[in-house]
Structures are given as structure tokens and as C-alpha cells.
UniProtKB/Swiss-Prot annotation:
GO terms for cellular component: cytosol. SMART domains: Aamy. Its EC number is 2.4.1.18. This is 1,4-alpha-glucan branching enzyme GlgB. Monomer.
């Protein structure tokens, strides 16, 4: 607990403030202005003191308009004080005058605190789960006045002020009250409201005035390159998504169809002049497109405020503020509601691993390493030149956990995909020997980060049933998606990076060589059910010179398109939830750049249109067939039919789940049609072809089996003879008797 700061006496025998206090107020260095300014008892009377730069005269009034006394100018810089005629301590308004005119202002120092002892208790304990209702800027009514309550955590600061256009960005005007025990500073500023830009002016423990800081809890920010926070009220949206939310509250997402369309909101589409679409414009275009294409969820790359476009949002300076690039925060609420009404979920890419060191951000926030570790071996990320959150500090953990809860509560998001989890879990991540500090047990595991992730997941799942968390975790850390009470991290799902790597490596090989790499596609099934997996073909695979998914496929142009369609068929038939980055659903040719829109004109060309139709039909099949999604995370839902035909590069398995017919998935990854190919099947009878990625309507050769094959029993074996089209995946569904 912090010791109370010793302050000078508030007045002498005559009621006047000590000269040292006056000088400190005028200089803007006083750490406890509430001990000097405002209304104070002196003897049996009341005195008022205020600092009003540029005023020549000041008269005090009650909020009801009763004159309370003229104040004397103690210092030409604008310090006034005087005895009041009122008998009861209360908030005051001042009428100020100079040669240029007169104006009114309400005294922020005549109001009592807004936060209470219970807030102090839970904040100090790190257990406050509604910090976003207490910290930041909130428009409220307080002691008879309307204004904005500001609160910020800066425990090592000597002085913190709110600055904005309402006080000419003068840090002497609205210095905050230090609550001491918690390190929270607060002030209620009357007569201002939503829409006002502001920052915090902080004097660090060494007495140095820091660069102006944005509010860590700001709900809105200025459009870059401006960096101020903006006073904003919570979304005032009339939500109509109860049916959607009720469905997912009562669902087990592991047994639901989850097909995710990963989107960068700033480049999916743009205006003709290259400017961003607003949230409302995105809602009008993106939501119908996602519905038509059959995806169940949109996953946005980070939309929290960030200063640098090429960071794609992964270097955020405003975790609580939807980026101003796309309009007001209410617009994002309308987008989510519109998506929900259309049956589409919204997942946010969330970045609690690190933050940029921009001067207006969290780095050295109060003049010390506050949100980050002081030791760069734990507090600085060498790959990204960013600061790493101090997960061992309860206030930092509380800041991050509250942010996860904030998006679920205020914006109704359906999930959080947590970025760079591996970098959080390992103290030696991307570090050489001597560049990292072992944990208390001598190991490389970041036990503090583990504890944070477990707490975050427990709170999200505990407070918001129906919201899922997804880990981007690229190592073999065990039990990422196991419950915390079983020793897991508590995520709902984990990205299957091995699937992505192995399959892309396989399909980059010329078909004649694939027989030597057969294990690339079979190995994944040895661990496919060790976690609840999402199969990601994400933005990471189409940037930094990696090309596009189409360009990664081996062969000439026809083979590339055929292989990509077959790959998608393979993936949609493979156990695990699906994720596809925007543009890859129609085989974008150019590598993705955040600076330009997708090449939508490609949909006018048949090969590209065919890939889009393939993805659309796969999505509808995946959603409508329980066998393809009901046991995505359970080994009982998968059985190999053909695992060892490396010579022909053929793979086959069957998917099944309660409530639906079994579906066989058969892939031929050579350009050679395999006629009279015998495939074992689990049941005799007719099997209907429900998709063939080589179909002519997709741009394929049109080879197939006339829509049906028949499996016959020969002794104990059941099989069907069929044609396997070149570079194709087909799915067969057992026809009910």
C-alpha cells in the first residue's frame, strides 16, 4: 500500500494559501491541488480558491446561481481566493472577467471524489472486473452537475492532469486527485461532454514532464496521425441479436460448424479514392457477401486503435477503442448487430502479448516501466521492437482481462483470437542464451503469462457463455484448449499451425514428387484430436513475399486452380474448424497488401469464380452435414479408408457424427484420373456424390461418377469402384435406405 503523500498546510491563520502552494499551483507542479483549490473550511467560515489564467476578476456562485463572494487575485497568473458568504460546503461556479470579455466555469476542485472505497479495494486487489466502467472518461452527473469523470492509473507520477481543447491543453488547469492507495488519479470536470479530445499530462517521479499520454481506457481515439483520446459514451445501440446470442450460449462450439472468414477491415474493399469504408458501409457489403459465401464467422484482424497502418493493427495503442479509421464506435456495434441478425458471428483478433513504444502510448506511462517489465530481457520484444506486458503485475493483468470482458459485453463479440500466444508462454522466445531470465523454478516457461491466460479464459467463459477464445500458438505446449481445472490454458480452440505448414509444403511439390511426401498429409492425424483445432489459412501465408495460396500450388495455371480447389475440399473434409483469409476464396493472384483493396474484378473470370463457388459449396456442405462438423474435435468422428497409397497420392477417410449420414472424403493429388479405383467404405449401399472439385461448373474437367457410386460387400469387406478425377477431392454421402 502506498504511503500518503505529505502536503503543505492548506491555509494560514488568515485563510490564505501558503505562498509555496500558490507558486506550485501556478507552476503546475503541485501534486495535491485538492488540498489547496476548491472550497475549504477556515475557522468557522468557508474559503474558495481557484486558478483561472487570464482572468482579472472572479466571482463565486452556487450551482443554483446565488452569489457567494468575490475572490481576490493572489497571483497575476490567475490564482484567486476569498471568503464565501455561503454556510454549507458545495460545488461552485465562477464568473471570470478580463478586458476581452467574461466567461463562466464550474470549479472541478469543489466536487468530491467519484470513486469509492470498494473501488479502491477491488482495484488494489486486482479483482475489479468492471474497470471499464470506472477508469477512462465517463460522462456522468455528479453532485448536481453534468460533466466527465476521468480516472487513470499512474502510481509513480508526481502529478497527473487532464488536458484538452477545453483548457487550452494547459496541464495546470485540471490536475487530478491522487487516490494514493491504488495509484489511481481522478477528477470530475463539469461542463464538458462527449466528443472532446483529451490526453494526460504526467510528471514522472524524477520531476520530468512526459510526452502527453493517450488514455489506456479510451473508448474512442482521433484518426491517425492525431493521437488524442476522445470522450465517448458507451454504444447506445438498440441490440436485436438475442436469438443469435442465445443460440451460441446453449451450443457447444466444438460440435458446431465454425467456418471463419478472416478480414482486414481496412483493405477488404475501399472507396474509389482509396479511403476506408465505414462500419455501416462494411455492413452493407461484407455481411451479405459472407452470408452468400457460407461462412459462419467473420474474424477481423485487430480493429483496436493503432497508429501505424502497416502493423495491420497488431501494434495497438488503444485496446478499448475501435479504430477511428472506420467511423464512430457505435458503427462497430451496428456492424456486429447486423452480422448477428444475419446469423454471422464476429471474432476479434486480440493482442495482449505486446504493445508499441510510441511516445503517446503505454510505454513508461508514468515515467517508470509500468505496463511493461523494466528489464528488457523480459520487457522488450526483439522481433517486433515492442514492449511486453508485465503479466506478474496484478493491475496489468486486470487491465487486459477487463479488455477481453469489455469487447464481449459492450460490443457483443462472439470470440477473441489471441495473437502470439507462443511469445507469451516462453521466456526465451526468439532470444539467445543470456538474453532471457529463467522463471523461479529455473525453467523457460513464463509462469506469469500462463496464469494470466488462465485467468482471462476463466473470466471470459464464466461471464460470457457463448463467447469462444482461440489461441494462435505455434508450439507443442500441452493442453492449450483444455479447461483450467484440468491444468490447461483454458482456450476454446487452438490454431493448427502444423496442418497449415505441412499441407502447404505438400501442395508446393510437383505431383510426380508428392509420393515421396505422403507423410506430410497423414502425420497431422496423429495429433489432430490432441487439441480443439482450427485449421488456419491465414494472412500470415500471403504476405512478406510468400505470394498467395494460388501461387503456392505447383504446376501450370490449370493445375494451380485444380490443386487449390482440391486442397480446399481436403481441408473442409478434414477434422477441425476452418479459417480462410480474404481474397483466397477466389484465388487472389497478387500478394495481399494493407494499402490496397482485393482484386474483386477476378470474380469475372471463370477460374477464379470457380474457386469461389467451390468454397461457397464447401461451406454449405460443412454446415448442413453433421458428419463434417459434429465431431471435428473427437477421434470417433474420423476413420481412415486409404492412408498408404503414396504411389498414387490418394487419400480417403470417412467422417461421421450423430444426426447425419457418414461422408467419405477422397482426394487424388495427381493430374492422372484414376479409373476403376477401389475405395473401402463403411457401409454397403448407394453413396451420393455431394461435391466434386473437378466439376465443370468450378472450372474443372468435369470427370466424375454420374453423381452416385454403389458400395458392395465382398465377404467381410465393403468397397466401391469409382473414377477419381485429376487433382480433385470428392465427397460421398451414404444414401439413407
Amino acid at each position: 500500500m502506498r504511503k500518503p503523500r505529505v502536503t503543505a498546510a492548506t491555509s494560514g491563520p488568515d485563510g490564505l494559501a501558503p505562498a509555496s502552494d500558490v507558486a506550485a499551483i501556478v507552476a503546475g507542479t503541485h501534486g495535491d491541488p485538492f488540498a489547496v483549490l476548491g472550497v475549504h473550511e477556515v475557522g468557522k467560515g468557508l474559503f474558495a480558491r481557484c486558478f483561472v489564467p487570464h482572468a482579472e476578476t472572479v466571482t463565486a456562485y452556487t450551482l443554483t446561481g446565488i452569489e457567494a463572494g468575490a475572490l481576490s487575485r493572489r497571483d497575476d497568473a490567475g490564482f484567486f481566493e476569498g471568503k464565501l458568504s455561503i454556510k454549507k460546503r458545495q460545488p461552485l461556479r465562477y464568473h471570470a472577467h478580463n478586458a476581452g470579455g467574461d466567461w463562466w466555469l464550474t470549479d472541478p476542485y469543489s466536487f468530491g471524489p467519484v470513486l469509492g472505497p470498494m473501488d479502491d479495494y477491488y482495484i488494489a486487489e486486482g479483482s475489479h472486473l468492471r474497470l471499464f466502467d470506472k477508469l477512462g472518461a465517463h460522462v456522468i452527473e455528479h453532485e448536481g452537475a453534468t460533466g466527465v469523470h476521468f480516472a487513470v492509473w499512474a502510481p509513480n507520477a508526481k502529478r497527473v492532469s487532464v488536458v484538452g481543447d477545453f483548457n487550452d491543453w494547459d496541464g495546470r488547469r485540471h490536475t487530478m486527485r491522487d487516490r494514493r492507495d491504488t495509484g489511481i488519479w481522478e477528477v470530475f470536470i463539469p461542463d464538458i461532454g462527449a466528443g472532446r479530445p483529451y490526453k494526460y499530462e504526467i510528471i514522472g517521479p524524477d520531476g520530468v514532464r512526459l510526452p502527453l499520454k493517450a488514455d489506456p481506457f479510451a473508448f474512442k481515439s482521433e484518426l491517425r496521425p492525431a493521437t488524442a483520446s476522445v470522450v465517448a459514451v458507451p454504444p447506445a445501440h438498440d441490440w436485436g441479436d438475442e436469438a443469435h446470442r442465445n443460440y451460441w450460449r446453449n451450443a457447444d462450439p466444438r460440435r458446431e460448424a465454425v467456418s471463419i472468414y478472416e478480414v482486414h477491415a481496412g483493405s477488404w474493399q475501399l472507396h474509389d479514392d482509396g479511403t476506408f469504408l465505414s462500419w455501416d458501409e462494411l455492413a452493407d457489403r461484407l455481411i451479405p457477401y459472407v452470408v452468400e459465401t457460407g461462412f459462419t464467422h467473420i474474424e477481423f484482424m485487430p480493429i483496436s486503435e493503432h497508429p501505424y497502418d502497416p502493423s495491420w493493427g497488431y501494434q495497438t495503442t488503444g485496446l478499448y477503442a475501435p479504430s477511428a479509421r472506420f467511423g464512430d464506435p457505435d458503427g462497430f456495434a451496428r456492424f456486429v448487430d447486423g452480422a448477428h441478425r444475419a446469423g454471422v458471428g464476429v471474432i476479434l483478433d486480440w493482442v495482449p502479448a505486446h504493445f508499441p513504444v510510441d511516445a503517446h502510448g503505454l510505454a513508461h506511462f508514468d515515467g517508470t516501466a509500468l505496463y511493461e517489465h523494466a528489464d528488457p530481457r523480459k520487457g522488450f520484444h526483439p522481433d517486433w521492437n515492442t514492449a511486453i506486458y508485465n503479466f506478474g503485475r496484478r493491475e496489468v493483468v486486470s487491465f487486459l482481462v477487463n479488455n477481453a470482458l469489455f469487447w464481449a459485453e459492450k460490443y457483443h463479440v462472439d470470440g477473441l483470437r489471441v495473437d502470439a500466444v507462443a511469445s507469451m508462454l516462453y521466456l526465451d522466445y526468439s532470444r539467445k542464451a543470456g538474453e532471457w531470465i529463467p522463471n523461479e523454478k529455473g525453467g523457460r516457461e513464463n509462469l506469469e503469462a500462463v496464469s494470466f491466460l488462465q485467468k482471462m479464459n476463466k473470466e471470459v467463459y464464466g461471464h460470457h457463455p457463448g463467447v469462444m477464445t482461440i489461441a494462435e500458438e505455434s508450439t507443442s505446449w500441452p493442453k492449450v484448449s483444455a479447461p483450467v481445472h484440468e491444468g490447461g490454458l483454458g482456450f476454446g480452440f487452438k490454431w493448427n499451425m502444423g496442418f497449415m505448414h505441412d499441407t502447404l509444403e505438400y501442395f508446393s511439390k510437383e505431383p510426380i514428387f508428392r509420393k515421396h511426401h505422403h507423410n506430410d498429409l497423414t502425420f497431422g492425424l496423429t495429433y489432430a484430436f490432441s487439441e480443439n483445432f482450427v485449421l488456419p489459412l491465414s494472412h500470415d501465408e500471403v504476405v512478406h513475399g510468400k505470394g498467395t495460396l494460388l501461387s503456392k500450388m505447383a504446376g501450370d495455371d490449370w493445375q494451380k486452380f485444380a490443386t487449390l480447389r482440391a486442397y480446399y475440399g481436403f481441408m473442409w473434409g478434414y477434422p477441425g474448424k476452418k479459417l480462410l483469409f480474404m481474397g483466397q476464396e477466389f484465388a487472389q493472384r497478387r500478394e495481399w497488401s494493407e494499402a490496397r483493396a482485393l482484386d474483386w474484378n477476378l470474380l469475372d473470370f471463370r477460374p477464379h469464380r470457380g474457386v469461389w463457388q467451390t468454397v461457397r459449396d464447401l461451406n454449405y456442405l460443412y454446415r448442413s452435414r453433421p458428419a463434417l462438423h459434429g465431431r471435428d474435435c473427437e477421434p470417433e468422428g474420423f476413420s481412415w479408408l486409404i492412408v498408404d497409397d503414396s504411389q498414387n497420392s490418394v487419400f480417403a477417410w470417412v467422417r461421421n457424427a450423430p444426426g447425419g449420414s457418414p461422408v467419405a472424403v477422397i482426394s487424388n493429388f495427381t493430374p492422372v484420373p484414376r479409373d476403376n479405383y477401389r475405395v473401402p467404405l463403411p457401409k454397403a449401399g448407394k453413396w451420393r456424390e455431394i461435391i466434386n472439385t473437378d466439376a465443370s461448373e468450378y472450372g474443372g474437367s468435369g470427370m466424375g461418377n454420374g453423381g452416385m457410386v454403389e458400395a458392395r460387400a465382398e465377404g467381410k469387406n465393403i468397397s466401391a469402384t469409382m473414377l477419381l478425377p485429376p487433382l480433385s477431392t470428392i465427397m460421398l454421402e451414404l444414401v439413407a435406405d
